[in-house]
């Protein structure tokens, strides 16, 4: 009998101690917004948007002006356009048509060609520093053009005087690498040993690139992290891509992803069915944010292409710690935010409110809402309002 009571007492003590150990989870809490008044000739349809801080610590939001050969810079403090860079299409400093870019400095901005495996390095005056061709690796393998975008978040990156670029998927050839590395000293192009994953049920090569076309990539200073939109797992690679680790990062709100049907798939189904989206690294808090598009229904009268461009109807964001453990997930209200337009600074995560079905939408303004990373005692029950 004494042993019985002793067990009860021990169990009670363990329970009390367990209550003291609070398993803090995290969520994204809505904060203030920031509004940029767009100049009359600046378009709100943005595929490439990146923050930039100059050598004096001055902060800007930069983005390509629609599909024009122009990058605009807005001052984050004044909320006004600070300057713009116009790029010639033809002539001595002609770069052709470009889509996407990466800013190393204002003296070294890398532009990715719209359709060709070419990159131009230019300065803030639009003068060409260098033209880089990456259509064939040093081993003779063909690489495909891929743009440096934020819409599908996979900007190119300069690290240790190497430029890490992407190669669009081509299921017809082998090898089929996701990325390549360009030595900026020698110009050598080396394909990296990480290939596009194969997805069951997506083996029809007649469909252009298949679902592998949609993916996101970020860099934490030590590793590259890939998020394919129709794959639960993320892929973590070493800088040289010789080591690849696969980690499951499943949304609490997605049972399974639904791939577009090769023959009968429509934009409507791509707006309704669940899948994953962009992955961003927050260097200030050492966490990651993975967008998840949740299953929903769309009115048949909706413009599906426009809805796709503006971030669909409803999404959540998974929060991962530095070891890629899920520590929270926040669901966002329908038709309010555009997760295709996000950026991060020392205050938190900014998500654009430029969704055409948002009642406050104005195509003469670019609006971002700040979300701060906060602790919560509740697991997976958080939603942004």
What does each of the following model-derived ranges do?
Residues 124-160, 166, 170:
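Asp-box/WD-like beta-propeller blade repeats and closely related beta-sheet repeat scaffolds
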Residues 32, 36, 81-88, 129-141, ...:
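Beta-propeller fold detector
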Residues 271-319:
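Loop/turn-rich, solvent-exposed surfaces of beta-rich toroidal or solenoidal domains
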Residues 47-55, 99-104, 148-160, 208-220, ...:
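Structural signature of eukaryotic scaffold interfaces centered on beta-propeller domains
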Residues 80-110, 114, 135-147, 332-338:
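Blade-loop segments of beta-propeller domains
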Residues 38-71, 289-293:
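Beta-strand-rich domains and repeat architectures in extracellular enzymes and scaffolds
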Residues 166-174, 290-311, 354-368:
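Short, conserved, GDST-rich strand-edge loop motifs in beta-rich repeat architectures
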Residues 176-187, 305-323, 364-378:
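Beta-propeller blade signature
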């Amino acid at each position: 009998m004494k042993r019985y009571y002793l067990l009860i007492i021990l169990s009670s003590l363990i329970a009390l101690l367990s209550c003291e150990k609070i398993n803090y989870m995290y969520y994204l809490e809505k904060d203030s917004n920031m509004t940029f008044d767009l100049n009359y000739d600046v378009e709100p349809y943005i595929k490439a948007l990146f923050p930039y801080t100059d050598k004096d610590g001055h902060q800007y939001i930069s983005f390509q002006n629609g599909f024009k050969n122009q990058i605009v810079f807005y001052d984050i403090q004044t909320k006004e356009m600070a300057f713009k860079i116009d790029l010639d299409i033809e002539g001595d400093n002609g770069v052709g048509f470009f889509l996407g870019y990466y800013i190393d400095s204002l003296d070294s901005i890398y532009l990715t060609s719209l359709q060709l495996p070419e990159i131009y390095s230019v300065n803030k005056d639009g003068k060409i520093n260098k033209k880089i061709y990456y259509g064939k690796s040093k081993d003779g393998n063909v690489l495909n053009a891929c743009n440096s975008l934020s819409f599908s978040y996979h900007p190119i990156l300069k690290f240790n005087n190497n430029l890490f670029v992407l190669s669009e998927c081509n299921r017809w050839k082998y090898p089929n690498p996701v990325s390549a590395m360009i030595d900026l000293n020698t110009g050598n192009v080396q394909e990296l040993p990480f290939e596009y994953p194969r997805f069951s049920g997506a083996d029809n090569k007649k469909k252009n690139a298949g679902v592998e076309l949609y993916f996101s990539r970020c860099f934490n200073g030590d590793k590259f992290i890939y998020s394919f939109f129709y794959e639960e797992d993320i892929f973590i690679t070493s800088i040289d891509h010789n080591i690849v680790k696969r980690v499951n990062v499943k949304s609490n709100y997605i049972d399974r992803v639904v791939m577009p049907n090769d023959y009968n798939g429509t934009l409507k189904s791509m707006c309704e069915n669940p899948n994953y989206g962009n992955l961003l690294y927050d260097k200030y808090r050492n966490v990651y944010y993975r967008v998840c598009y949740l299953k929903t229904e769309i009115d048949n009268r909706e413009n599906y292409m426009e809805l796709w461009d503006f971030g669909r109807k409803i999404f959540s964001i998974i929060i991962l710690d530095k070891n890629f453990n899920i520590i929270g997930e926040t669901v966002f209200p329908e038709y309010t935010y555009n997760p295709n337009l996000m950026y991060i600074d020392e205050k938190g995560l900014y998500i654009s409110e430029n969704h055409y079905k948002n009642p406050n939408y104005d195509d003469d303004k670019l609006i971002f809402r700040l979300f701060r990373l906060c602790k919560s005692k509740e697991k997976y029950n958080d939603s942004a309002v």
